Amino acid sequence: MEPIFKNIDSKYNEILAVNSQVLTNDRNGESRVGDFFMDVLKNGFKADVALYNGGAIRDTLPSGRVTVRDLLKIFPFDSTIYTAEVKGSDLRQVLEHGIGNPDISRLRFSGLQISADIRREEGQRISSVTLSDGSTLADEKYYKVISNDFMFSGGDGFTACKMHGI
């Protein structure tokens, strides 16, 4: 068994990158590691928007050598990433549910700038949504959204995602 564990350990300790600074994670507050990975997903898959449930991001990214083990601590769940064309009105519902909701970890996203009052009731929180290209979110337009299977299956109450058949 020892050769098997050595092989597994060597894979987990494989260096993937070098990070110059710590990227912190607060599941209910600011998540620099969440922001970073949402930007990676959005840009890497040429999506308009990246969304991820905050509860799926579990750790901080250390400075220095970044290993497979580090990434597995951050993303410990066996998630699959999908893209879907999502109607603007559905995306707005997802954002309303994901910001300021005390029952779930804060929604992580990239490609959007949101003006909202999280003290208001769900459905009344968001006053404006601007995409990274400067355009305003249009309810009738479809956007390429990248997210994980948990969100696209309606997990954490993200029922507007569930309609997209992932």
For each feature predicted by the language model, list its residue ranges:
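Feature captures C-terminal
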Residues: 31, 35-166
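Acidic/histidine-rich, surface-exposed loop or edge segments in extracytoplasmic proteins
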Residues: 12-24, 73, 158-164
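Phosphate-interacting basic helix/loop segments used at nucleotide- and nucleic-acid interfaces
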Residues: 25-26, 35
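Binuclear metal-dependent phosphoesterase catalytic core
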Residues: 1-19, 113-130
